[in-house]
């Protein structure tokens, strides 16, 4: 069982979340200066929520795979 792809998914989704956070911060700054609208801020908030959800799901999948791997490695041979 190879967990490396799942670890890469965790790393990738973490980067995506960070970029979504930056985008939201930028939209909020633009809104404060009058160069954006609440619609674009809402979109950035929605995208950040989705990115956080994707990251959480990736972490859960990775941790489950680690538990499964440990279980398989500790199982007695027949």
Region locations from a protein language model:
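Amphipathic alpha-helical coiled-coil segments
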Residues: 1-54, 61-72
């Amino acid at each position: 069982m190879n967990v490396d792809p799942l670890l890469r998914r965790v790393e990738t989704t973490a980067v995506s979340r960070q970029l979504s956070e930056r985008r939201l911060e930028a939209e909020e700054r633009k809104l404060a200066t009058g160069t954006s609208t609440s619609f674009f801020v809402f979109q950035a908030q929605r995208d950040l929520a989705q990115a956080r959800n994707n990251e959480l799901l990736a972490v859960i999948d990775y941790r489950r795979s680690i538990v499964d791997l440990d279980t398989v490695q500790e199982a007695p041979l027949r």
